[in-house]
Amino acid sequence: IICAPEGGPCVAGIGCCAGLRCSGAKLGLAGSCQ
């Protein structure tokens, strides 16, 4: 599994690298890792 770096796409807290959290994700829309 490849993780997303800061600023990368994510969905509901899934997909970010360690230490990052998903910001701005809404139902059906991807957020960005912060």
Curated annotation (Swiss-Prot):
A cellular component term from Gene Ontology for this protein is: extracellular region
GO MF term list? toxin activity
Q: Which domain of life is it from?
A: Eukaryota
Please give the name of this protein.
U4-theraphotoxin-Hs1a
According to its UniProt entry, what is the function of this protein? Answer: Intracisternal injection paralyzes mice.
Tissues expressed in: Expressed by the venom gland.
Disulfide links within the chain: 3-17, 10-22, 16-33
Its domain comment says: The presence of a 'disulfide through disulfide knot' structurally defines this protein as a knottin.
- Keyword DNA-binding listed? The answer is no
Give the originating organism: Cyriopagopus schmidti (Chinese bird spider)
According to its UniProt record, where is this protein located? Secreted
Q: According to its UniProt record, where is this protein mainly located?
A: secreted
Q: Which residues cross the membrane?
A: none
Keywords associated with the record: Disulfide bond, Knottin, Secreted, Toxin
Question: Which family is it part of?
Answer: Belongs to the neurotoxin 14 (magi-1) family. 05 (ICK-7) subfamily.
